[in-house]
């Protein structure tokens, strides 16, 4: 089967566990996910089956929205609730106004240092493997983009914020840095991913939904179409001649179109056909094709 599932990941399992469960339910090997969530985090994780796995790379340009609970006055070695406490300090002096003003410092492009408990590699080793050995190394700072951050509630010592951010943002690091700026320390108490591009919690499925669909023989019916993952890309409708060229792996020329990194191609029947990318000579080549070439009729 080819398609996408918008899964609401429960607490306590890894993103790989989600993929494994989907593989078992669908009896299908070609399954992947579109964005790792830590075991303690819950919420949206798109899961791709069959041909749709070829679209995972295009999710890197979409934003994610998180609901985060941050507790002030405590730091942990993992920056979240799973780690060992390394620092405590009273936060009685912190006001809602102080938090609001400090959060504004995190708008736009910011510099983050990945947590030691992360999948980032250092000399070929995952940081979390080094951290479990009690080894701390210097990490290379990274640029992250925060499109919006909203303070929803503050009842000392816990605040709730909604964050819209770009690819590669560490909410744990944001919580840690917020605590440092406020002078009292902080850690990420809980995290829910509410949205990831076109996918959101409102129309997500849990594993009970998948099991029910399996019992009813409706597993194919709950799959989202491939184009759900690339709704953020520019799109163009092409005639049969150009579609045929793309299906055959040939470049095409387009007039009056901007040149983003990728464009989704549809045919006259509004069916998703391919993703094309620009060449330096002004032509476009097929990066991914999702329909097969129709067999040629006999010459008789």
UniProtKB/Swiss-Prot annotation:
Task: Supply the EC number(s).
Answer: 5.4.99.25
Q: Does the keyword Isomerase apply?
A: yes
**tRNA processing keyword on record:** yes
Keywords per UniProt:
Isomerase, tRNA processing
Gene3D superfamilies in the record, alphabetically?
Pseudouridine synthase (3.30.2350.10)
Q: Name one GO molecular function term.
A: tRNA pseudouridine(55) synthase activity
Q: Which reaction does it catalyse?
A: uridine(55) in tRNA = pseudouridine(55) in tRNA
What are the GO BP annotations of this UniProt entry? mRNA pseudouridine synthesis; tRNA pseudouridine synthesis
User: What CDD domains does UniProt report for this protein, alphabetically?
Assistant: PseudoU_synth_EcTruB
User: From the record, what ranges are coiled-coil?
Assistant: none
- Write out the catalytic residues in the record: 38
Could you tell me which PANTHER family the record lists for this protein?
PSEUDOURIDYLATE SYNTHASE TRUB1, TRNA-PSEUDOURIDINE SYNTHASE
The protein's job, in short, is: Responsible for synthesis of pseudouridine from uracil-55 in the psi GC loop of transfer RNAs.
By its UniProt entry, which HAMAP family does this protein fall under?
TruB_bact
Give the record's family classification. Belongs to the pseudouridine synthase TruB family. Type 1 subfamily.
Q: What name is this protein filed under?
A: tRNA pseudouridine synthase B
Q: From which source organism is this entry?
A: Dehalococcoides mccartyi (strain ATCC BAA-2100 / JCM 16839 / KCTC 5957 / BAV1)
Show the taxonomic lineage: Bacteria, Bacillati, Chloroflexota, Dehalococcoidia, Dehalococcoidales
